[in-house]
Structures are given as structure tokens and as C-alpha cells.
């Protein structure tokens, strides 16, 4: 029923934690595709063997980054639904079971759920848990995602046919997941599932992985958002005005025609 795509880059401890959360799932009809773009360590054979054949592990060359890894994995999927799980996030044991039960009565094109944020200190090994927050994004809509995306990639489930001819932009430094979601939403709608069994693990803002991806660079964020606004026009006047207002709040004057 599910293919779970996990791109990874030189984070063996975090990847092992993610895989262990999949091993612990009460629902077993899924396949995991791990794509490693660094080949800097021995694959986690113990974790993979516990998946009992329900995995594909790929070591790829070329430019590092999750976009190309996800694109490669998408070509190998043959399930009803596809999930993109970051290599530092985890699923609680009943997550896939809850998803499967919700799909018994309907087959939404895109499904999303709430989540928990697990703050942690990654300067120690293994990471030390600091605090938790529960986050509801039940009010997220298709229109709101065209203004600002609050849905973590790991909280989304895509019906396989939605992904036909879709690919992640490998040239983007940040927000390639938002770009991908917007492309999928042009012809499809979002459905919310009120569960919060996805754990989004976060390190300090100045952690190396955040600096590498540009997530702390306000100038990159604004530039990327404006590019996405041009690439994916708002669906209605209200969304265009909301985009303009959001940019104005950041001190950026953007003509309505660019929103």
C-alpha cells in the first residue's frame, strides 16, 4: 500500500532512528526506499534486515541533496501511496495503521496530518531530547499552501498517480518540497487526517545541517518564496493579496502581478 522514500546524507545515527520507527510499525504492508547520497558509512544492515525484505537501499553518486534522491526513488515505486520521510524524522508505531484505515473508505489525492515537534541537542551522541510541542495544521487549505506552507514533508501522503511526471527541482537550495507540493496541488486537493503520530525532530537553528541547507538565511527564504510565487500563480485574488501582504510584512514590496 505504501512506499516510504527516505533520502539521507551522512547521518547514520539519525537514519537508524528513523528506520527503527518503521520497523516498529503495527502495519506492515509497506516498502522503504533509502537513497544515500554520501556513501560515507556502512549501510545500517541490522536495521535493514529487521525490515525483512521490505526495503531497497541505494547509494548514488553525483550532487548531494534530497531532491535528486527523491527523484531517483520515485522511479522505483509501485504502491498505491507514496510518503517522503526525512532521515531525521520518525513515525509513531500506529501511524501507518491509521493511514491505512483512513484509506479504506476513500482515496484522496493528497492526505496530510498533524505532528509533534521534538527539539533535541545533536551535539551529543545519541541526540538528547529537550522538549516537545504538538502542532495542529487542521486549518491548512489548498489556498493557504499557495501563500505559505506549514505542512512538513513527512506529514504528507501522495496517491501514486499524482506523482506521474512530477519531479523535485534539484537546483533549489531550500523549499524544493514546497515547490513539489504546489505542482501536485494544481490539479488536486488536500484532505486532512486528524492524527499527530509524525515526529519532526529539530536541532538548534545554528546546527550544521541547517546552515548547509540555508534554512537560517532570511535573504534566501524571501528570494525562494518570490520565485515560487512566480512559478506557481495563486489560484484566486484572495491568495494573491495574502501573498502580497506576507511579503510586505517582511519589508518586501511586491506588485500584485508578481504574486
Q: What does each of the following model-derived ranges do?
A:
Residues 1-3, 21, 31, 179:
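Cell-envelope/extracellular polymer assembly enzymes that use nucleotide-activated donors
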Residues 2-14, 18, 25, 35:
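A conserved hydrophobic helix/loop-capping motif in glycosyltransferases and polysaccharide synthases
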Residues 19-59:
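Acidic donor-binding segment of Leloir-type glycosyltransferases
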Residues 60-77:
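Glycine-rich, basic loop-to-helix element that forms the pyrophosphate-binding segment
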Residues 82:
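Short aromatic/hydrophobic "clamp" motif used to bind/position activated sugar donors
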Residues 86-90, 114:
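The conserved acidic donor/metal-binding loop of glycosyltransferases
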Residues 94-127:
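Conserved donor NDP-sugar-binding/catalytic core segment of glycosyltransferases
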Residues 135-222:
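Conserved nucleotide-sugar donor-binding catalytic segment
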Amino acid at each position: 500500500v505504501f512506499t516510504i522514500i527516505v533520502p539521507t546524507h551522512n547521518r547514520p545515527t539519525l537514519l537508524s532512528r528513523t528506520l527503527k520507527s518503521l520497523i516498529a510499525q503495527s502495519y506492515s504492508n509497506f516498502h522503504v526506499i533509502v537513497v544515500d547520497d554520501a556513501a560515507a558509512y556502512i549501510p545500517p544492515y541490522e536495521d535493514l534486515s529487521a525490515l525483512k525484505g521490505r526495503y531497497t537501499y541505494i547509494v548514488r553518486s553525483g550532487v548531494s541533496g534530497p531532491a535528486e534522491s527523491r527523484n531517483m526513488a520515485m522511479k522505483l515505486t509501485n504502491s498505491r501511496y507514496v510518503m517522503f520521510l526525512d532521515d531525521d524524522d520518525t513515525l509513531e508505531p500506529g501511524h501507518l495503521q491509521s493511514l491505512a484505515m483512513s484509506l479504506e473508505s476513500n482515496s484522496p489525492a493528497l492526505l496530510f496530518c498533524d505532528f509533534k515537534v521534538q527539539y533535541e541537542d545533536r551535539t551529543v551522541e545519541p541526540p538528547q531530547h529537550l522538549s516537545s510541542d504538538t502542532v495542529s495544521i487542521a486549518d491548512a487549505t489548498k489556498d493557504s499552501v499557495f501563500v505559505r506552507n506549514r505542512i512538513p514533508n513527512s506529514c504528507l501522503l501522495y496517491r501514486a498517480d499524482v506523482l506521474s511526471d512530477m519531479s523535485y527541482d534539484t537546483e533549489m537550495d531550500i523549499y524544493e518540497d514546497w515547490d513539489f507540493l504546489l505542482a501536485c496541488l494544481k490539479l488536486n486537493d488536500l484532505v486532512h487526517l486528524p492524527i499527530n503520530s509524525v515526529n519532526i525532530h529539530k536541532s538548534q537553528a545554528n546546527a550544521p545541517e541547517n546552515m548547509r541547507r540555508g534554512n537560517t538565511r532570511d535573504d534566501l527564504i524571501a528570494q525562494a518564496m518570490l520565485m515560487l510565487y512566480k512559478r506557481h500563480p495563486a489560484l484566486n485574488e484572495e491568495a494573491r493579496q495574502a501573498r502580497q501582504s506576507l511579503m510586505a510584512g517582511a519589508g518586501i514590496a511586491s506588485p500584485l502581478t508578481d504574486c
